[in-house]
């Protein structure tokens, strides 16, 4: 029986793409650049590729923040090089943008009556702490684990070992829910816990991962927990 849930935040409980759009629109506007849908798509692709490198241990968090902006600005000949300032402003904008998915806050309230719930996220400390506070998620869960603070990121087993030591969760009674196969599901596999892939777009499993459950709507989780 599942009595502990490890939740991913961005792309699972909160709409990250909507937040990303808000963040880039806000920050580009401040330097006199208008964001188009094509530019947003290119930035999303660049950002995703950098985070995938990070998950594989091929780059640091700091290299992500500078590298993705260098690549994106270079793509559109944007003559702006204060990457550190732009990134700091961007992290704050991301934290200000809260777009719950599938009425997720109500779901957290309901599940909190019978389960322990912890947030496990690779997002930046600034953005995560802001959005968790603004959304109220920090008050609806039993703890928050941000990889930047922990010093290790998903999907590394050591990240989950840290969470287990801090919470005392029992592997056989714990489920991770997330949208990323390479971070959340692979991390759950490494940790030896059950996995639930949030897959609203009906994608296919790829890579060396094992998925125990797949859901298209977060509320389907209630059926899984009732088994």
Question: Where do the protein language model's features map onto the residues?
Answer:
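Glycine-centered short loops/turns at secondary-structure junctions
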Residues: 114-115, 192
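Asp-based, Mg2+/Mn2+-dependent phosphohydrolase catalytic module
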Residues: 1-5, 18, 29, 109, ...
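Catalytic-core regions built around general acid/base machinery
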Residues: 103-114
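N-terminal helical cap/lid subdomain that shapes the substrate entry/recognition surface
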Residues: 2-102
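Short, conserved clusters of charged catalytic residues that mark active-site
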Residues: 102-103, 158
């Amino acid at each position: 029986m599942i009595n502990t849930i490890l939740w991913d935040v961005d792309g699972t409980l909160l709409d990250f793409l909507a937040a990303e759009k808000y963040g880039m629109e806000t920050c580009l506007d401040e330097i006199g650049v208008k964001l188009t849908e094509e530019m947003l798509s290119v930035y999303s692709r660049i950002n995703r590729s950098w985070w995938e490198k990070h998950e594989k241990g091929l780059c640091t968090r700091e290299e992500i923040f500078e590298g993705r902006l260098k690549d994106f600005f270079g793509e559109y000949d944007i003559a702006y090089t204060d990457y550190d300032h732009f990134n700091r402003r961007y992290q704050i904008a991301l934290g200000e943008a809260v777009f719950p998915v599938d009425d997720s806050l109500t779901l957290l309230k309901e599940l909190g009556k019978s389960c322990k719930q912890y947030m496990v996220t690779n997002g930046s400390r600034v953005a995560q702490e802001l959005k968790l506070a603004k959304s109220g998620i920090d008050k609806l869960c039993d703890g928050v684990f941000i990889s930047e603070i922990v010093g290790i990121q998903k999907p590394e087993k050591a990240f989950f070992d840290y969470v287990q030591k801090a919470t005392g969760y029992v592997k056989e009674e714990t489920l991770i829910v997330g949208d990323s196969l390479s971070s959340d599901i692979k991390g759950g596999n490494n940790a030896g816990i059950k996995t639930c892939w949030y897959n609203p777009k009906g994608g296919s499993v790829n890579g060396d991962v094992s998925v125990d459950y797949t859901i298209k709507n977060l509320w389907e989780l209630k059926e899984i927990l009732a088994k």
